[in-house]
Amino acid sequence: MDWGNVTVDDLFDALREVDWSSPPRPPSEFFSRFTVPKSVPKWDSRLKCNLYYYRTNYFIMIVVILGLGVLTRPLAIFAALLTALSLAFLNDSFAGSFSEKATRTVRRFSPQLAAKMRPPLTPVTRGRPSSKRAIHVCGQPRWVFVLTCSLVSFALWYISSGLLRVSVALLIAHLATILHASLRTPNLKARFNTFREEFRAVWRNYSEI
């Protein structure tokens, strides 16, 4: 895959749709080899490749840095967790998995309520979905959960007076992510993994037809 031809929008769409349940790469691979890119196009391609391949590692690193920044403020810790949850809901795989597990848990106690938590059916025309299926969480549009978690987390940030700390922590976390993604040399395993996930995505789209 030529990452130089991948736009920022394509990268965000891929990160939104890809499965994030895969475990992070081992530290021996994550901190293996670093080199300075020889040109701006090579840097651009390397940055996108590493952001996609090491996405779970970067997410954990950002959460850890945020946690260290608000360690002495309990309310800020809850705010950080809600912020991470609101961002996680933007991923299709996480939102669907969370909704399925929550519905399955509620079904044990109240089957009627669990039935209301199911996503609405997508209209079908000539055997195919008439439109792209919208993501629902517990029967509600995804944006409801994203907006709720974001508003509550912002209120907790404000109450705990941790906005300055979290801003500095976020800045450090993002700089560390960009620095690592810029200097980490992509290996053959990363390229092979990209091709494999591309094949899975194509096969999944083909099976839905």
Swiss-Prot record:
InterPro entries assigned: Prenylated_rab_accept_PRA1
One Pfam family assigned to this protein is PRA1
Where in the cell? Endoplasmic reticulum membrane
Keywords assigned by UniProt, alphabetized: Endoplasmic reticulum, Membrane, Transmembrane, Transmembrane helix, Transport
Q: Which GO terms describe its cellular component?
A: endoplasmic reticulum; endoplasmic reticulum membrane
**Membrane topology type:** Multi-pass membrane protein
Residue spans crossing the bilayer: 51-73, 77-99, 144-164, 166-186
> Per the record's keyword annotation, is Transmembrane helix included, yes or no?
yes
Q: Which GO terms describe its biological process?
A: vesicle-mediated transport
The domain of life for this entry's organism is Eukaryota
PANTHER family assigned to the protein according to its UniProt record, in alphabetical order: PRA1 FAMILY PROTEIN, PRA1 PROTEIN
**Similarity annotation:** Belongs to the PRA1 family.
| Reported function | May be involved in both secretory and endocytic intracellular trafficking in the endosomal/prevacuolar compartments.
Q: What is this protein called?
A: PRA1 family protein A1
Organism annotation? Arabidopsis thaliana
The organism's taxonomic lineage, starting at the top: Eukaryota, Viridiplantae, Streptophyta, Embryophyta, Tracheophyta
Gene that encodes it: PRA1A1
